[in-house]
Amino acid sequence: MPMQGAQRKLLGSLNSTPTATSNPGLAANHTGAPCLEVSIPDGLFLSLGLVSLVENVLVVAAIAKNRNLHSSMYYFICCLALSDLLVSGSNMLETAIILLLEAGTLATRASVVQQLHNTIDVLTCSSMLCSLCFLGAIAVDRYISIFYALRYHSIMTLPRAQRAIAAIWVASVLSSTLFITYYDHAAVLLCLVVFFLAMLVLMAVLYVHMLARACQHAQGIIRLHNRQLPAHKGFGLRGAATLTILLGIFFLCWGPFFLHLTLVVFCPQHLTCNCIFKNFKVFLTLIICNTIIDPLIYAFRSQELRRTLKEVLLCSSWPGCWAEGGGDSVWPGSCVTLRGPLPP
């Protein structure tokens, strides 16, 4: 985790950001031209990470406690929360270590710091890949639940979901290890960018198709009850707005980071690109914000999960609560295949 002044890095190998200034404003590039640089205070960054950490821990605990949530749909949501938890946790850990090194509180050998840096980079990269994969997996699961509703439980069985989850985690760890090892190859960065674009296209295609089917279904109900067409148009507008918010948040939170990686490949020395590189920490902050928003979109919309979450919060102040909960606190146990929240 080598430092240059106040610079901090998520994937230190992938970040070619020049030394950052301590205050927001206009920084000068090599020609003296003004360059907008937004500074994110470490306290704000750590606070957002802590909010994400607590939020996703609650999601994992709620799903683990309630056997009614032990279905493939909620397993994917649980793994998304776990990967988001690791994203925020690894960023908080790296920031804390950097602050301790800068303050001279943490003194250790350079080789130990470098090994720690590499370990955190692998953890961060693998958790980011997992987060993207599980967002795609949730979209696929919801697509199957709508277009193959009668065969959903025979297609999306629990063993298949568990194998898919295991494959995602293993592939993400192996891929991130290779990415960090061969960070100086442009192909590595391009693979990450292509992977992000593939997930974006997959989610867009599936959710747009689901929205179209929902509109057709609503139109059929309207015709059946001889209602007026404007009601159908209103439903379509609400669905389109929900879809825009869903994909818009995903793109706005993840897009700048992968834009950064793209520019590192194609214009590492260009003055305009260097101005963008100076805002690398802003891009990381947007990813942390996404880990805060994910539970609001995918988890907390479920009434069953919200009810269990209240029980978890009550149990935190009642020591014997989990023990008295009977079989509900066992993981994974037998499950009731519950399809979960409807698509947006």
UniProtKB/Swiss-Prot annotation:
Coiled coil location: none
SUPFAM superfamilies per UniProt:
Family A G protein-coupled receptor-like
Which positions are lipidated as S-palmitoyl cysteine?
Answer: C315
* Keyword Glycoprotein applies: yes
Q: Which regions span the lipid bilayer?
A: 38-63, 73-93, 119-140, 164-183, 192-211, 241-266, 280-300
- One of the Pfam families matching this protein, by short name: 7tm_1
State where the protein is found. Cell membrane
The source's domain of life comes to: Eukaryota
Q: Which residues are glycosylated?
A: N29
What keywords appear on the UniProt entry? Cell membrane, G-protein coupled receptor, Glycoprotein, Lipoprotein, Membrane, Palmitate, Receptor, Transducer, Transmembrane, Transmembrane helix
GO CC terms in record: plasma membrane
Checking SMART domains in the record gives: 7TM_GPCR_Srsx
InterPro entries recorded for this chain? GPCR_Rhodpsn, GPCR_Rhodpsn_7TM, Melcrt_ACTH_rcpt, MSH_rcpt
Q: How does it sit in the membrane?
A: Multi-pass membrane protein
Could you tell me one molecular function GO term of this UniProt entry? melanocyte-stimulating hormone receptor activity
Q: Does the keyword Cell membrane apply?
A: yes
What family is this? Belongs to the G-protein coupled receptor 1 family.
Q: What does this protein do?
A: Receptor for MSH (alpha, beta and gamma) and ACTH. The activity of this receptor is mediated by G proteins which activate adenylate cyclase. Mediates melanogenesis, the production of eumelanin (black/brown) and phaeomelanin (red/yellow), via regulation of cAMP signaling in melanocytes.
Q: Assembly and interactions?
A: Interacts with MGRN1, but does not undergo MGRN1-mediated ubiquitination; this interaction competes with GNAS-binding and thus inhibits agonist-induced cAMP production. Interacts with OPN3; the interaction results in a decrease in MC1R-mediated cAMP signaling and ultimately a decrease in melanin production in melanocytes.
Tell me what this protein is called.
Melanocyte-stimulating hormone receptor
